[in-house]
Amino acid sequence: MLDVKRIRNNPEAVRIAIELKGEKADIDRFLELDEKRRQMLVELETLKNRRNVESDNIAKLKREGKDASDLIAEMKELSDKIKEMEQEVKEVEEELERILWTIPNIPHESVPIGDSDEDNVEIRRWGEPRKFDFEPKPHWEIGQELDILDFEAAARVTGSRFTFYKGLGARLERALINFMLDLHIEKHGYTEVFPPFMVHRRSMFGTGQLPKFEEDAFKVYGTDYFLIPTAEVPVTNMYRDTIIDGDKLPIYHCAYSACFRQEAGSAGRDTRGLIRQHQFNKVELVKFTEPDKSYEELEKMTRDAEEVLQALGLPYRVVVICTGDLGFTASKKYDIEVWMPSYGRYVEISSCSNCEDFQARRANIKYRPKDGGKAQYVHTLNGSGVAVGRTFAAILENYQQEDGSVVIPEVLRPYMKVDVIKK
């Protein structure tokens, strides 16, 4: 959520930023309502002051034994008018809030201008895609042939876009989760959190999923609970309605969770295999920082996520996301894309975002500066560290052998207790 003063003081800049994001918000109506509200509050304050004065006058007349009935009648009319105006102010504020909730975060000045993912800018690559002397298979074929993935059974039990991991497949998924957590905790300094997999509506609002993206969320029937689309939601909301001691910043958290998404509007896009599932595992990175440190922390977070892929020997590239592809809550975002041989292209495996104070305003997360000054909103950052199912898929594709087996990356062997998955 943007600072109202920012919109009020520089509406044209906000309007341009919204257009660059490809979003829509009625800034003119917002400004009209904002001015109306401010005028109404001034008038309301004047009426309340008058009521206070007349109350004193009534009390004085009564003490003097004089008739105060006319003044009492006027006071009743005045009180009714105040009550009516308070209701009008409430209605104006509710409409203001509804518009404010639709206004996206403002892109950082360093974000490239563009309309879609075709305008994202590659900034670096790591590793060389492997050259195969045989035709590489897609990960879903490899997994089914090795009997470590079962899409058909999951479809019978639940439906499409779900998977059973079996045998060494289940062990590989678990090994990846533990490896990622261990790396981020032991080397990068994150504190692990194991969050609830359900949150209520206010938490989804706090991180920006609601009200705009409700159609992409799984709601628990008959309750106010939602299955989390990412651990970013519960971990960020751990600090909702709190003031953090400035000496404790920055705060680093990592969390494993299952994630649940409708993937509305994604029909036909990567629907085979593990790339676009309704339920998937992810290790999430979340940071809370002082405003002047958040972009430095974004670079660190992105490097932390990259190190997972480097340790696994998976080629990848990093792109900075353009304005039109940036999303609702982020001011700046990097995507890390892993090489998938059967696709012949890089596929997103992590997004690392700086939301500045956008989520903090929605969730009311502040910090007390070290000098003891007035509490300010923190900056929040989040990133995948990384998506586990997509990493599983990338390992199957990049480490597949001609005989159908898959070599286990060396860093995972202590977790797996085997070097190769084979028939």
Curated annotation (Swiss-Prot):
Short name of one Pfam family: tRNA-synt_2b
Chain sites annotated for binding L-serine: 230-232, 284, 384
The protein's annotated pathway: Aminoacyl-tRNA biosynthesis; selenocysteinyl-tRNA(Sec) biosynthesis; L-seryl-tRNA(Sec) from L-serine and tRNA(Sec): step 1/1
Subcellular location: Cytoplasm
Residue numbers binding ATP: 261-263, 348-351
InterPro entries reported in the protein's UniProt record: aa-tRNA-synt_IIb, aa-tRNA-synth_II, aa-tRNA-synth_II/BPL/LPL, Ser-tRNA-ligase_type_1, Ser-tRNA-synth_1_N, SerRS_1_N_sf, SerRS_core, tRNA-bd_arm
Any GO BP annotation: selenocysteine biosynthetic process
Highest taxon, organism lineage: Bacteria
Reaction(s) this enzyme catalyzes, per UniProt: tRNA(Ser) + L-serine + ATP = L-seryl-tRNA(Ser) + AMP + diphosphate + H(+); tRNA(Sec) + L-serine + ATP = L-seryl-tRNA(Sec) + AMP + diphosphate + H(+)
Gene Ontology annotations for the cellular component aspect, listed alphabetically: cytoplasm
Entry EC number(s): 6.1.1.11
Matching PROSITE patterns: AA_TRNA_LIGASE_II
GO molecular function, one term: transferase activity
Keyword field: Aminoacyl-tRNA synthetase, ATP-binding, Cytoplasm, Ligase, Nucleotide-binding, Protein biosynthesis
Biological role: Catalyzes the attachment of serine to tRNA(Ser). Is also able to aminoacylate tRNA(Sec) with serine, to form the misacylated tRNA L-seryl-tRNA(Sec), which will be further converted into selenocysteinyl-tRNA(Sec).
Record family assignment: Belongs to the class-II aminoacyl-tRNA synthetase family. Type-1 seryl-tRNA synthetase subfamily.
Domain notes: Consists of two distinct domains, a catalytic core and a N-terminal extension that is involved in tRNA binding.
Subunit structure: Homodimer. The tRNA molecule binds across the dimer.
Name of the featured protein: Serine--tRNA ligase
